[in-house]
Curated annotation (Swiss-Prot):
Pathway per the UniProt entry: Amino-acid biosynthesis; L-histidine biosynthesis; L-histidine from 5-phospho-alpha-D-ribose 1-diphosphate: step 5/9
Protein's name according to its UniProt entry: Imidazole glycerol phosphate synthase subunit HisH
GO terms under cellular component: cytoplasm
Hydrolase in keyword set: yes
Species per Swiss-Prot/TrEMBL record: Sulfurisphaera tokodaii (strain DSM 16993 / JCM 10545 / NBRC 100140 / 7)
GO BP terms in the entry: L-histidine biosynthetic process
Catalytic activity: 5-[(5-phospho-1-deoxy-D-ribulos-1-ylimino)methylamino]-1-(5-phospho-beta-D-ribosyl)imidazole-4-carboxamide + L-glutamine = D-erythro-1-(imidazol-4-yl)glycerol 3-phosphate + 5-amino-1-(5-phospho-beta-D-ribosyl)imidazole-4-carboxamide + L-glutamate + H(+); L-glutamine + H2O = L-glutamate + NH4(+)
EC number: 4.3.2.10, 3.5.1.2
Quaternary structure and interacting proteins, as annotated: Heterodimer of HisH and HisF.
Amino acid sequence: MKATLINYGVGNLFSIKAGLERVGFNVKISFLPEGDEDVIVLPGVGAFSAVSSYLNSMKDKFNELRERGVKFLGVCLGMQVMFDEGTEGGLSKGLGWFKGKVDKIHSNVKLPHIGWDKLFVNKDSCNLTEGLDGKYVYYVHSYVAYTNDYVAYSEYGIKYPAIVCNDFAVGTQFHPEKSSVTGKIFLRNFYSWVKR
């Protein structure tokens, strides 16, 4: 299966590329969708305001791809920009694929949050969490999505969404490519979800 990893022009994309390739995806890094992919991946690098502006410029193309059955994976910031809006870098509109607002973690904890936290499965309507409940995944973030609709969550001062999904998009606040065996299990589950 073909995956296009969208390059926002910042950060190292090779670890997420390698993680996707390990579970069977043929990955190409590009500034724009290729048009023949099965999956578009929005990586977790950059700031919400700049990245959401860049991705919203492609929203019509994304909608065409969705109608064709293309699936989307957002990692960390890539998940956050799938929500209605975010405050990092000033209030900005997201893609609006999930209801909710992305804001700083509202708690007296050290930020950024860097490290391993446990996953708790909430309600998995997308069959993405087999083998994940109670396992640890790796986070690097200061912002979270404030929403009540999530597949799995973690806790750091507050409970926050770790995995979200709908019929065409999946988002993870954690970095599967940095989450060792648990990350690989998630990416395998995602591969199976795309194949369905």
